[in-house]
From Swiss-Prot:
One Pfam entry name: Flu_PA
Site (Important for efficient shutoff activity and nuclear localization): 195, 198-199
Keyword Transferase belongs to the record: no
Annotated family: Belongs to the influenza viruses PA-X family.
Record remark on domains: The probable endonuclease active site in the N-terminus and the basic amino acid cluster in the C-terminus are important for the shutoff activity. The C-terminus acts as a nuclear localization signal. The C-terminus is recruited to host protein complexes involved in nuclear Pol II RNA processing.
Site (Important for efficient shutoff activity) residue list: 202-203, 206
Keywords: Decay of host mRNAs by virus, Eukaryotic host gene expression shutoff by virus, Host cytoplasm, Host gene expression shutoff by virus, Host mRNA suppression by virus, Host nucleus, Host-virus interaction
The protein, known as: Protein PA-X
Cellular compartments annotated: Host cytoplasm; Host nucleus
GO BP field: viral RNA genome replication; viral translational frameshifting
Length: 252
Protein backbone atom coordinates (compact mmCIF):
# COMPACT_ATOMS: atom_id res chain seq x y z
CA UNK A 1 0.00 0.00 0.00
CA UNK A 2 2.82 2.43 0.80
CA UNK A 3 4.31 1.94 -2.67
CA UNK A 4 0.87 2.51 -4.21
CA UNK A 5 0.46 5.79 -2.30
CA UNK A 6 3.87 7.12 -3.33
CA UNK A 7 3.29 6.18 -6.97
CA UNK A 8 -0.27 7.41 -7.34
CA UNK A 9 -0.44 10.66 -5.39
CA UNK A 10 1.22 13.99 -5.95
CA UNK A 11 4.50 14.20 -3.95
CA UNK A 12 3.29 17.33 -2.17
CA UNK A 13 0.16 15.51 -0.99
CA UNK A 14 2.27 12.58 0.22
CA UNK A 15 4.54 14.97 2.14
CA UNK A 16 1.58 16.74 3.77
CA UNK A 17 0.04 13.39 4.76
CA UNK A 18 3.31 12.22 6.31
CA UNK A 19 3.60 15.43 8.32
CA UNK A 20 -0.01 15.14 9.51
CA UNK A 21 0.51 11.56 10.69
CA UNK A 22 3.80 12.32 12.42
CA UNK A 23 2.13 15.26 14.19
CA UNK A 24 -0.12 12.69 15.87
CA UNK A 25 2.67 10.17 16.48
CA UNK A 26 1.59 7.84 13.67
CA UNK A 27 3.91 6.02 11.27
CA UNK A 28 2.97 6.09 7.54
CA UNK A 29 5.06 2.96 6.96
CA UNK A 30 3.04 0.96 9.49
CA UNK A 31 -0.41 2.52 9.21
CA UNK A 32 -0.50 2.42 5.43
CA UNK A 33 -4.29 2.33 5.10
CA UNK A 34 -4.58 5.54 7.09
CA UNK A 35 -1.76 6.97 4.96
CA UNK A 36 -3.76 6.21 1.81
CA UNK A 37 -6.97 7.59 3.34
CA UNK A 38 -5.31 10.88 4.34
CA UNK A 39 -3.76 11.32 0.89
CA UNK A 40 -7.13 10.66 -0.73
CA UNK A 41 -8.87 13.16 1.53
CA UNK A 42 -6.22 15.81 0.87
CA UNK A 43 -6.52 15.35 -2.88
CA UNK A 44 -10.32 15.67 -2.74
CA UNK A 45 -9.98 18.90 -0.76
CA UNK A 46 -7.61 20.33 -3.37
CA UNK A 47 -9.88 19.21 -6.21
CA UNK A 48 -12.85 20.77 -4.41
CA UNK A 49 -11.07 24.12 -4.50
CA UNK A 50 -9.67 23.76 -8.01
CA UNK A 51 -10.82 26.18 -10.73
CA UNK A 52 -13.23 28.04 -8.43
CA UNK A 53 -12.74 31.79 -8.06
CA UNK A 54 -14.62 34.95 -7.14
CA UNK A 55 -14.35 37.85 -9.59
CA UNK A 56 -14.21 41.60 -8.93
CA UNK A 57 -18.03 41.72 -8.80
CA UNK A 58 -18.12 39.07 -6.10
CA UNK A 59 -19.54 36.45 -8.46
CA UNK A 60 -18.41 32.82 -8.35
CA UNK A 61 -16.77 31.72 -11.60
CA UNK A 62 -14.90 28.69 -12.92
CA UNK A 63 -11.55 29.35 -14.60
CA UNK A 64 -9.43 26.45 -15.87
CA UNK A 65 -6.55 28.53 -17.25
CA UNK A 66 -5.16 31.22 -14.98
CA UNK A 67 -5.00 34.80 -16.28
CA UNK A 68 -2.42 36.78 -14.26
CA UNK A 69 -4.26 40.01 -15.09
CA UNK A 70 -7.64 38.83 -13.83
CA UNK A 71 -8.73 40.18 -10.45
CA UNK A 72 -9.67 36.82 -9.05
CA UNK A 73 -9.82 35.50 -5.52
CA UNK A 74 -9.90 31.82 -4.64
CA UNK A 75 -13.44 30.90 -3.66
CA UNK A 76 -12.24 28.33 -1.15
CA UNK A 77 -9.63 28.66 1.59
CA UNK A 78 -7.91 25.33 2.11
CA UNK A 79 -7.49 24.59 5.82
CA UNK A 80 -6.85 20.85 5.60
CA UNK A 81 -3.16 20.01 5.17
CA UNK A 82 -1.78 22.71 7.45
CA UNK A 83 -0.30 22.03 10.87
CA UNK A 84 -2.82 22.56 13.67
CA UNK A 85 -1.38 25.87 14.86
CA UNK A 86 -1.45 27.41 11.39
CA UNK A 87 -4.88 25.93 10.66
CA UNK A 88 -6.44 27.48 13.77
CA UNK A 89 -4.73 30.79 12.97
CA UNK A 90 -6.41 30.79 9.56
CA UNK A 91 -9.78 29.81 11.06
CA UNK A 92 -9.56 32.57 13.68
CA UNK A 93 -8.62 35.11 11.02
CA UNK A 94 -11.61 34.10 8.88
CA UNK A 95 -13.97 34.32 11.85
CA UNK A 96 -12.66 37.74 12.86
CA UNK A 97 -12.95 39.04 9.30
CA UNK A 98 -16.33 37.58 8.35
CA UNK A 99 -18.07 37.32 11.71
CA UNK A 100 -18.96 33.65 11.20
CA UNK A 101 -19.17 31.39 14.23
CA UNK A 102 -15.92 29.67 15.19
CA UNK A 103 -16.19 25.90 14.70
CA UNK A 104 -15.44 23.52 17.54
CA UNK A 105 -13.39 21.24 15.29
CA UNK A 106 -11.02 22.15 12.47
CA UNK A 107 -12.93 22.15 9.16
CA UNK A 108 -11.39 21.37 5.78
CA UNK A 109 -12.34 24.44 3.75
CA UNK A 110 -13.94 27.86 3.94
CA UNK A 111 -16.31 28.99 1.18
CA UNK A 112 -16.01 32.76 0.67
CA UNK A 113 -19.10 32.81 -1.57
CA UNK A 114 -21.49 31.11 0.85
CA UNK A 115 -19.59 32.33 3.94
CA UNK A 116 -19.41 28.96 5.62
CA UNK A 117 -16.90 26.34 6.69
CA UNK A 118 -17.04 22.99 4.92
CA UNK A 119 -16.26 19.53 6.26
CA UNK A 120 -15.37 17.21 3.39
CA UNK A 121 -15.65 13.48 3.97
CA UNK A 122 -14.44 10.53 1.91
CA UNK A 123 -15.83 7.19 2.98
CA UNK A 124 -15.41 3.52 2.15
CA UNK A 125 -18.83 2.82 3.68
CA UNK A 126 -22.41 3.99 3.13
CA UNK A 127 -22.50 7.76 2.65
CA UNK A 128 -25.51 8.33 4.91
CA UNK A 129 -23.87 6.47 7.81
CA UNK A 130 -20.68 8.50 7.53
CA UNK A 131 -22.68 11.71 7.12
CA UNK A 132 -24.58 11.06 10.35
CA UNK A 133 -21.32 10.31 12.19
CA UNK A 134 -19.85 13.61 10.99
CA UNK A 135 -22.99 15.56 11.88
CA UNK A 136 -23.14 13.98 15.33
CA UNK A 137 -19.49 14.87 15.97
CA UNK A 138 -19.65 18.46 14.71
CA UNK A 139 -23.05 19.28 16.24
CA UNK A 140 -23.24 22.58 14.37
CA UNK A 141 -25.55 23.69 11.58
CA UNK A 142 -23.03 26.37 10.66
CA UNK A 143 -20.50 23.90 9.22
CA UNK A 144 -21.57 22.47 5.88
CA UNK A 145 -20.93 18.75 5.37
CA UNK A 146 -20.23 17.13 2.01
CA UNK A 147 -19.51 13.40 1.82
CA UNK A 148 -18.15 11.46 -1.17
CA UNK A 149 -17.80 7.70 -1.55
CA UNK A 150 -15.59 5.52 -3.73
CA UNK A 151 -18.72 4.24 -5.51
CA UNK A 152 -19.82 7.62 -6.86
CA UNK A 153 -22.37 8.44 -4.18
CA UNK A 154 -22.45 11.73 -2.29
CA UNK A 155 -24.46 13.42 0.44
CA UNK A 156 -24.49 17.03 1.60
CA UNK A 157 -26.23 19.22 4.14
CA UNK A 158 -29.76 20.08 2.95
CA UNK A 159 -28.85 18.53 -0.43
CA UNK A 160 -26.77 21.63 -1.15
CA UNK A 161 -23.78 20.26 -3.06
CA UNK A 162 -21.92 23.61 -3.30
CA UNK A 163 -20.06 22.70 -6.50
CA UNK A 164 -21.33 22.39 -10.06
CA UNK A 165 -22.01 18.91 -11.42
CA UNK A 166 -18.86 18.78 -13.54
CA UNK A 167 -16.56 19.60 -10.62
CA UNK A 168 -18.20 16.94 -8.47
CA UNK A 169 -17.95 14.44 -11.33
CA UNK A 170 -14.17 14.98 -11.48
CA UNK A 171 -13.89 14.14 -7.79
CA UNK A 172 -16.09 11.04 -8.14
CA UNK A 173 -14.11 9.85 -11.16
CA UNK A 174 -10.82 10.23 -9.30
CA UNK A 175 -12.14 8.29 -6.30
CA UNK A 176 -13.45 5.53 -8.55
CA UNK A 177 -10.07 5.36 -10.30
CA UNK A 178 -8.26 5.05 -6.96
CA UNK A 179 -10.59 2.21 -6.00
CA UNK A 180 -10.01 0.39 -9.30
CA UNK A 181 -6.24 0.80 -9.05
CA UNK A 182 -6.25 -0.53 -5.48
CA UNK A 183 -8.40 -3.48 -6.53
CA UNK A 184 -6.09 -4.32 -9.44
CA UNK A 185 -3.21 -4.57 -6.94
CA UNK A 186 -5.18 -6.60 -4.40
CA UNK A 187 -5.24 -3.70 -1.91
CA UNK A 188 -8.91 -2.72 -1.88
CA UNK A 189 -10.21 -5.44 0.49
CA UNK A 190 -7.66 -4.59 3.18
CA UNK A 191 -8.38 -0.87 2.69
CA UNK A 192 -12.08 -1.46 3.39
CA UNK A 193 -11.83 -4.14 6.11
CA UNK A 194 -9.93 -3.37 9.37
CA UNK A 195 -9.58 -7.10 10.10
CA UNK A 196 -8.04 -7.74 6.70
CA UNK A 197 -5.80 -4.70 7.18
CA UNK A 198 -4.39 -6.12 10.44
CA UNK A 199 -3.70 -9.43 8.73
CA UNK A 200 -1.94 -7.62 5.89
CA UNK A 201 0.10 -5.55 8.36
CA UNK A 202 1.40 -8.70 10.08
CA UNK A 203 2.28 -10.12 6.67
CA UNK A 204 4.08 -6.91 5.66
CA UNK A 205 6.06 -6.78 8.92
CA UNK A 206 7.13 -10.39 8.43
CA UNK A 207 8.24 -9.60 4.87
CA UNK A 208 10.24 -6.61 6.13
CA UNK A 209 12.07 -8.86 8.58
CA UNK A 210 12.91 -11.32 5.80
CA UNK A 211 14.11 -8.56 3.48
CA UNK A 212 15.94 -6.48 6.08
CA UNK A 213 19.36 -7.56 4.86
CA UNK A 214 18.72 -6.98 1.17
CA UNK A 215 20.15 -3.87 -0.56
CA UNK A 216 17.57 -1.30 -1.66
CA UNK A 217 17.64 1.59 -4.09
CA UNK A 218 15.06 4.36 -3.91
CA UNK A 219 14.41 7.10 -6.46
CA UNK A 220 13.59 10.54 -5.08
CA UNK A 221 12.90 12.37 -8.32
CA UNK A 222 10.88 15.54 -7.86
CA UNK A 223 8.16 16.64 -10.24
CA UNK A 224 9.32 19.81 -12.10
CA UNK A 225 6.11 21.60 -11.16
CA UNK A 226 6.76 21.02 -7.47
CA UNK A 227 10.30 22.42 -7.56
CA UNK A 228 8.82 25.90 -7.85
CA UNK A 229 5.73 25.29 -5.74
CA UNK A 230 5.60 27.54 -2.68
CA UNK A 231 3.62 26.63 0.45
CA UNK A 232 0.00 26.44 -0.68
CA UNK A 233 -1.27 29.21 1.58
CA UNK A 234 1.31 31.66 0.20
CA UNK A 235 0.97 31.09 -3.55
CA UNK A 236 -2.07 32.34 -5.48
CA UNK A 237 -1.57 29.55 -8.03
CA UNK A 238 -1.27 26.81 -5.42
CA UNK A 239 -4.00 24.53 -6.72
CA UNK A 240 -3.11 25.10 -10.37
CA UNK A 241 0.48 24.00 -9.77
CA UNK A 242 -0.71 21.05 -7.71
CA UNK A 243 -3.16 20.00 -10.39
CA UNK A 244 -0.51 20.23 -13.12
CA UNK A 245 1.70 17.69 -11.38
CA UNK A 246 -0.91 15.07 -10.47
CA UNK A 247 0.53 11.65 -11.21
CA UNK A 248 -1.40 8.81 -12.78
CA UNK A 249 -1.11 5.42 -11.15
CA UNK A 250 1.33 3.31 -13.17
CA UNK A 251 0.25 -0.21 -13.99
CA UNK A 252 2.38 -3.13 -12.91
Amino acid sequence: MEDFVRQCFNPMIVELAEKAMKEYGEDPKLETNKFAAICTHLEVCFMYSDFHFIDERGESIIVESSDPNALLKHRFEIIEGRDRTMAWTVVNSICNTTGVEKPKFLPDLYDYKENRFIEVGVTRREVHIYYLEKANKIKSEKTHIHIFSFTGEEMATKEDYTLDEESRARIKTRLYTIRQEMASRGLWDSFVSPREAKRQLKKDLKSQELCAGLPTKVSHRTSPALKTLEPMWMDSNRTAALRASFLKCPKK
